[in-house]
Regions:
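N-terminal Sec signal peptide cleavage junction
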Residues: 1-2
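Short, glycine-/small- and polar/acidic-enriched structural segments
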Residues: 5-169, 182, 186, 209, ...
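Soluble non-cytosolic domains of exported or imported proteins
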Residues: 24, 71, 144-148, 185-189, ...
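Short, solvent-exposed loop/beta-turn-alpha elements that line the ligand-binding surface or hinge
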Residues: 38-57, 210-216, 231, 291-303
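Pocket-lining segment of extracytoplasmic ligand-binding domains
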Residues: 94, 169-272
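Short, surface-exposed acidic
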Residues: 160-165, 203-208, 268-286, 322-332
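Conserved C-terminal helix/tail region of periplasmic/extracytoplasmic solute-binding proteins
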Residues: 306-362
């Protein structure tokens, strides 16, 4: 942030951010921007306060809104057109494509580099299964929410078969625990904690593979604006997007205060969703360990790679799913507001990116004594 008040007059007096679920640590960068003067409205499921940039008041307010049940489970892209008070909303690559003709939005920054969605199973029951493709070959029942793009896509690609996918999952742990021999969808930054510490009748580690690592590389929960407002919003976004980038970096470095705010928000909403310090801390660590939050190949946190977006569009078209013919990454995403100087310290994209794919020690044989 350049100085106090830098967003006043260029951004809306209240920057409204629509998220896709109850408050959770995966949304940490959003709540990181909410100042200590915050007000939580449990009925409307919002958290509002001064919009802060690394502790500096930007001169406008920010309101972070819960999604999911809070908006009747409406997709956040569609919600942007239902409620024009929303400044930015979470938008997934596949949703942007799906709604493009009726509700076009442009992604401007992605706090998450990898989608946290995964499939998990009990490694004691399936010791030789390591990937989603392995689940397909073994014909393991896969319990998922209905209507998910990636399950339809994996069926179309032959990774999974339609008869093994059961779209009746309702979020309850009962079946996974009772049957023991099924795979189930979840967030890699959440469910592994719950099934080890919260659901004590299971009480052990799961094994999982990210949907991303299985070949479906959407940008999940990226921030988007309505497409026809992009140029009008540009003076605001030029200043706001780097603040969002830095907020995510700040949250990952020191999440304690913001996680406490997230927990307070969940308690105020007082619904079926619960959250505590244990899962909040686990979530941040998992996001780092799995590279869910990481710098892209250009060294910055939050930018988009066209090849990734275009690959998802190609996958949708090959599977016979909606993706307008001429649509490409350059329509759906922009890096024009990204500050390439802002990223996780220490080149987090490489530290995370090699674990598990390269040998634990990479040995390089040179041809002489050490020399320049």
């Amino acid at each position: 942030a350049d100085s106090a008040g830098e967003l006043a007059g260029v951004c809306p007096a209240t920057v409204v951010i629509q998220t896709d679920w109850f408050p959770e640590s995966e949304h940490g960068g959003m709540y990181e921007m909410v100042g200590d003067d915050y007000v939580i409205d449990g009925d409307n499921q919002t958290t509002t306060g001064s919009l802060m940039a690394s502790g500096v008041d930007t001169g406008v307010d920010v309101q972070v809104r819960a999604g999911g049940p809070a908006i009747g489970f409406q997709n956040t892209v569609a919600q942007m057109y239902t409620d024009t008070d929303i400044t930015l909303a979470y938008a997934d690559t596949d949703s942007v494509a799906f709604f493009w003709e009726d509700a076009p939005v442009v992604q401007v920054v992605t706090p998450l580099d990898k989608n946290p969605q995964m499939l998990m199973w009990d490694p004691e029951v399936y010791p030789n299964i390591y990937t989603i493709a392995d689940l397909g070959e073994a014909d393991v029942t896969v319990s998922v929410f209905g209507g998910g793009t990636w399950t339809e896509l994996f069926i179309a690609e032959g990774v999974l078969s339609s008869d093994q996918v059961d779209p009746s999952y309702d979020g309850s742990p009962a079946r996974f625990i009772a049957e023991g021999n099924i795979a189930q969808q979840g967030y890699a930054s959440a469910e592994p904690w719950d099934y080890k510490h919260k659901f004590t009748e299971f009480g052990k580690d799961v094994r999982l593979q990210l949907v991303h690592d299985a070949g479906f590389e959407v940008y999940k929960s990226a921030l988007a604006v309505r497409a026809d407002e992009l140029d009008e919003m540009a003076p605001c976004l030029e200043r706001l997007v780097p603040i969002v980038q830095q907020a995510q970096v700040d949250f990952m470095a020191d999440p304690g205060r913001t996680n406490a705010l997230i927990i307070e928000g969940v308690e105020a909403i007082a619904s079926f969703w619960t959250y505590d310090e244990g899962i909040a801390a686990f979530s941040v660590q998992a996001m780092l360990d799995l590279g869910l939050v990481s710098n892209g190949p250009n060294g910055a946190l939050g930018d988009f790679i066209d090849e990734r977006t275009n690959a998802v569009l190609d996958q949708r078209r090959a599977a016979g799913m909606d993706a307008p013919a001429g649509l490409s990454a350059s329509d759906m995403t922009t890096n024009r507001f990204i500050d390439y100087n802002i990223g996780l310290p220490g080149g987090a994209e490489t530290a995370v990116g090699l674990a598990g794919v390269c040998p634990a020690t990479v040995v390089i044989q040179t041809d002489w004594f050490p020399e320049s």
